[in-house]
């Protein structure tokens, strides 16, 4: 029996807060207005309905022709901010803003944060460890939390997440612009009928009698489609209910997201993402075979190697000495496979990965018939991001001096920020996409693209330029 080709990716983020006015005033001050949601909107366990806020498609998903003809705010942002020394050496990231919609601009900075976070995780791992994260889920969760942050705590988060860079890029941008764009991004990504399944749940659980501000609850609902629900964290029934909810969303792939909770926990944020996509160019099951995969200079393992032939976009980066292949999913999502030519080249590639580099790859790609060999793999990763985020400069959020007065009048300390994610890549899922050549040599002499050594992968949604998932496969034979 033949099955449609697909890839499964999912991510779960948990943030727990244990026991520390102004959001309404802030929103009023910045003249922020949002459309009201249908009464039953939040009863959906995924944000996949077809509700379209008035005017949003016209404002944030513009074609380049519209950008050039209607609004110079989308064209000359680079002139508004001078690049720093570090950015000058690698190319000012704000230059990527030209010709981009506001949502694409926000996602460029979300990707910059994701690559920095990835590097911290990489430094904590060994070279033989696989890595997998869902950047869109992490950024969304941090955006939600930042609604209630004040003072230096708010500044730290906005600086590390590069939200501050976004606001400084244009006089027309404000802090509340970011939350509005996350709202629109969530709506765009999780609508139906794009040829793939992408589902998300944002749940906010609050210990009974814990005084969460009503304006914070309302803002969570409006901007991030997150419902605040009462919970008794000491009650095993709560864990069972939460796990059942996540089990249903992830189609059984994450069975016990919550093993136990501290009775002192007062707030928990769950962000869960599930993705299932069909490859544009399918991998015939009968072509899968055992193949050598080089772990390092000394070790080789046998893996199940998928094989197909078709038109694929690819490029070669001589500076980073790597090859790039784009595998396209049905519906406007693609996976970039990035493989160093030398086994020793992964460190350099990881150190220099930036949004500028990715855009140059995409612009240098050429389309031709290629034979592709890609190993099947499944990754399951579970991270507590507290120490990771601390090392990146977010410290006050996780200590008693943090200012979360926009969430509660009582002091709150976040002691757990859990990120759990799973990806399954097999014959039932793959993809590819295109652009023009700028400064890179195309893979003109190579007709076979063989992924037989450690590689990186990046999963993007094209219309929003959103980095959904990324990771490193050092050994396809283990999770």
Swiss-Prot record:
What glycosylation sites does the entry record?
A: 31, 168, 367, 403
* PTM field: Different composition of the N-linked oligosaccharides appears to yield a 68-kDa and a 72-kDa form.
Q: Which keywords does this chain's UniProt record carry?
A: Blood coagulation, Glycoprotein, Hemostasis, Heparin-binding, Protease inhibitor, Repeat, Serine protease inhibitor, Signal, Sulfation
Query: Which stretches of sequence are listed as region 2 X 11 AA approximate repeats, Asp/Glu-rich (acidic) (hirudin-like)?
Result: 55-79
Q: Does the keyword Transmembrane apply?
A: no
Ranges for the region named Glycosaminoglycan-binding site are 172-192
Q: Which residues carry this modification: Sulfotyrosine?
A: 61, 74
sequence repeat positions in this chain?
Answer: 55-65, 69-79
**Domain of life of the native organism:** Eukaryota
PROSITE patterns documented for this protein: SERPIN (PS00284)
Give me the segments passing through the membrane.
Answer: none
Biological process annotations from GO: blood coagulation
Signal peptide residues are: 1-23
Q: Which GO terms describe its cellular component?
A: extracellular space
Q: Where is this site: Reactive bond?
A: 443-444
A molecular-function term among this protein's GO annotations: heparin binding
Quote the function comment for this protein. Answer: Thrombin inhibitor activated by the glycosaminoglycans, heparin or dermatan sulfate. In the presence of the latter, HC-II becomes the predominant thrombin inhibitor in place of antithrombin III (AT).
Q: What does its UniProt record remark on the domains?
A: The N-terminal acidic repeat region mediates, in part, the glycosaminoglycan-accelerated thrombin inhibition.
The family this protein is said to belong to: Belongs to the serpin family.
Q: What is this protein called?
A: Heparin cofactor 2
Q: Which gene encodes it?
A: Serpind1
């Amino acid at each position: 029996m033949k099955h449609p080709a697909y890839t499964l990716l999912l991510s779960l983020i948990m943030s727990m807060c244990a026991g520390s006015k102004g959001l309404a005033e802030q929103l009023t001050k910045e003249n922020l207005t949002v459309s009201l949601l249908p009464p039953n909107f939040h009863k959906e366990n995924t944000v996949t309905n077809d509700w379209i806020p008035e005017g949003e498609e016209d404002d944030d998903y513009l074609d380049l022709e519209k950008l050039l003809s209607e609004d110079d705010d989308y064209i000359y942002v680079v002139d508004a901010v001078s690049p720093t020394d570090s950015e000058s050496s690698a190319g000012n990231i704000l230059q990527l803003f030209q010709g981009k919609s506001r949502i694409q601009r926000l996602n460029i900075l979300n990707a910059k944060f994701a690559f920095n976070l990835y590097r911290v995780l990489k430094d904590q791992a060994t070279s033989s460890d696989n890595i997998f994260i869902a950047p869109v889920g992490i950024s969304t969760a941090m955006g939600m939390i930042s609604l209630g942050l004040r003072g230096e705590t708010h500044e730290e988060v906005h600086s590390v997440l590069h939200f501050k860079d976004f606001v400084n890029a244009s006089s027309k941008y404000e802090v509340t612009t970011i939350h509005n764009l996350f709202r629109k991004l969530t709506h765009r990504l999780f609508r139906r009928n794009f040829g793939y399944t992408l589902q998300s749940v944002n749940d906010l659980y609050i210990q009974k009698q814990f005084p969460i501000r009503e304006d914070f609850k309302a803002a969570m609902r409006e901007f991030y489609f997150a419902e605040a629900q009462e919970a008794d964290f000491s009650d095993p029934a709560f864990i069972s209910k939460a796990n059942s909810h996540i089990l249903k969303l992830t189609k059984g792939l994450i069975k016990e997201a919550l093993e136990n909770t501290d009775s002192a926990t007062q707030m928990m944020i769950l962000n869960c993402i599930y993705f299932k996509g069909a490859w544009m160019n399918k991998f015939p099951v009968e072509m899968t075979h055992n193949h050598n995969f080089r772990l390092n200079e000394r070790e080789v393992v046998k893996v199940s190697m998928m094989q197909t032939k078709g038109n694929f976009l690819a490029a070669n980066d001589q500076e980073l000495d790597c090859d790039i292949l784009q595998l396209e999913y049905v519906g406007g999502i693609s996976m970039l496979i990035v493989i160093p030519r030398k086994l020793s080249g992964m460190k350099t590639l990881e150190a220099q990965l930036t949004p500028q580099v990715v855009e140059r790859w995409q612009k240098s790609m050429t389309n031709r018939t290629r034979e592709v060999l890609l190993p099947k793999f499944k990754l399951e990763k579970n991270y507590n991001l507290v120490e990771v985020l601390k090392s990146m400069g977010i410290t006050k959020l996780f200590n008693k001096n943090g200012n979360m007065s926009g969430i509660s009048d009582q002091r709150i300390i976040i002691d757990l920020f859990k990120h759990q994610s799973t990806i399954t890549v097999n014959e039932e899922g793959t993809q590819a996409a295109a652009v023009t050549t700028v400064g890179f040599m195309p893979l003109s002499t190579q007709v076979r693209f063989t992924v037989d050594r450690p590689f990186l992968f990046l999963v993007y949604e094209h219309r929003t330029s959103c980095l959904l998932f990324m990771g490193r496969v050092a050994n396809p034979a283990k999770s």
